[in-house]
């Protein structure tokens, strides 16, 4: 590369010769992100991380070599329009070596008529092939699980990786909370960026909407609306909750899969982690000991967590109603029972 560049560039006065190895740029640690699974979700995540300039190198891993090579080439061919990022790919975990962040999107698809337990067991078998090798190649990495059922598989990844719980995170209800904020913003006719609102607990149908967490411009939304006698009744609240829970199903029913929203959701998590932003996100973390969840129940579910370069830096103690806390504990109990069936 140095010899070729010397044909185009000339050193400044008193500068090193173009080909001199000591003239390289001052050392800066490069950031590497690996994405395991090159399906619709994995590629949306890779594309979003690429366009947001979050990594110097992106490694793609998938079991289908031709599709993988095609996806990598498709991104590489856009190099003139994107930040300078090295894109590598392979079917072997060795390509992920020295990653800072490993995003796992691979997962077994449910067969019609298959039980939830059988699907979980097939996913565990898949994770046994994926997680230990990537953990071995990048022992200091952060592990971000996106595959569903995300809470159980985050637990599986934690057990199989041997990483501390602070470095194993599930995407959890980060996207659910984005949908929540969007729908509240639509109802109030404000920007979603000015709305704070959290969905917590198990990702999916049993996620818990924390109504008291809703604020707009720093003002508690429900109290302000009640004080001004504006409408935000129980029916409206329940309608929003149902729309949040059904959001993914609606998208899948219309286009066959979800991709872009989860891509942006994961990129927001990657930004907080890799750039040490210490922002609070509702993500799947080890929840034992929080909100009455037994210390002996090693379950992962979503709680507002402060994220930085070291992973989970702390979990916010929310002021939940008894009904919200009870629902959270029920989800934890169900997740714990499912995890016990996996024999990890």
Swiss-Prot record:
GO terms for molecular function: L-lactate dehydrogenase activity. GO terms for biological process: lactate metabolic process. Substrate binds at residues 116, 148, 179, 258. The active site is at residue 203. NAD(+) binds at residues 62-67, 109, 148. GO terms for cellular component: cytoplasm. InterPro entries: L-lactate/malate_DH (IPR001557), L-lactate_DH (IPR011304), L-lactate_DH_AS (IPR018177), Lactate/malate_DH_C (IPR022383), Lactate/malate_DH_N (IPR001236), Lactate_DH/Glyco_Ohase_4_C (IPR015955), NAD(P)-bd_dom_sf (IPR036291). Keywords: NAD, Oxidoreductase, Stress response. Induction: By hypoxia. HAMAP family: Lactate_dehydrog. The keyword Oxidoreductase applies. Belongs to the LDH/MDH superfamily. LDH family. Its EC number is 1.1.1.27. It catalyses: (S)-lactate + NAD(+) = pyruvate + NADH + H(+). This is L-lactate dehydrogenase B. Pfam families: Ldh_1_C, Ldh_1_N. Tetramer that arise from random association of LDH-A and LDH-B. It comes from the Eukaryota. Pathway: Fermentation; pyruvate fermentation to lactate; (S)-lactate from pyruvate: step 1/1. The keyword Oxidoreductase applies. It comes from Hordeum vulgare (Barley).
């Amino acid at each position: 590369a140095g010899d070729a560049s010397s044909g185009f560039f000339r050193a400044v006065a008193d500068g090193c010769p173009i080909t001199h190895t000591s003239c390289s740029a001052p050392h800066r640690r490069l950031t590497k992100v690996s994405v395991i699974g090159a399906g619709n979700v994995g590629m949306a995540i890779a594309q979003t991380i690429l366009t947001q300039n979050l990594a110097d190198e992106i490694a793609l891993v998938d079991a289908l070599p031709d599709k993988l090579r095609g996806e990598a080439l498709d991104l590489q061919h856009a190099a003139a329009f994107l930040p300078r990022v090295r894109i590598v790919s392979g079917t072997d975990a060795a390509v992920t070596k020295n990653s800072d962040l490993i995003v796992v999107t691979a997962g077994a698809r449910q067969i019609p008529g298959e039980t939830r337990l059988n699907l979980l067991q097939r996913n565990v078998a898949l994770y046994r092939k994926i997680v230990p090798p990537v953990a071995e190649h990048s022992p200091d990495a952060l592990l971000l699980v996106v595959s569903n059922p995300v809470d159980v598989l985050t637990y599986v990844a934690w057990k199989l990786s041997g990483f501390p719980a602070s470095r194993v995170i599930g995407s959890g209800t980060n996207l659910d909370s984005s949908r929540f904020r969007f729908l509240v913003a639509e109802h109030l006719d404000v920007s979603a960026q000015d709305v704070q609102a959290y969905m917590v607990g198990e990702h999916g149908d049993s996620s818990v909407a924390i109504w008291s967490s809703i604020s707009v411009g720093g003002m508690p939304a429900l109290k302000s609306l009640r004080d001004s006698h504006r409408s935000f009744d129980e029916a409206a609240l329940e309608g929003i909750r149902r729309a949040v829970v059904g959001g993914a199903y609606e998208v899948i029913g219309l286009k066959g899969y979800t991709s872009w929203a989860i891509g942006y959701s994961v990129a927001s998590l990657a930004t907080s982690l890799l750039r040490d932003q210490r922002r609070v996100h509702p993500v799947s973390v080890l929840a034992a000991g929080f909100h009455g969840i037994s210390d002996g129940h090693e379950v992962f579910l979503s709680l507002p967590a402060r994220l930085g370069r070291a992973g989970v830096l702390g979990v916010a103690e929310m002021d939940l109603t008894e009904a919200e806390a009870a629902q959270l504990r029920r989800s934890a109990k169900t997740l714990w029972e499912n995890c016990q069936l996996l024999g990890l």
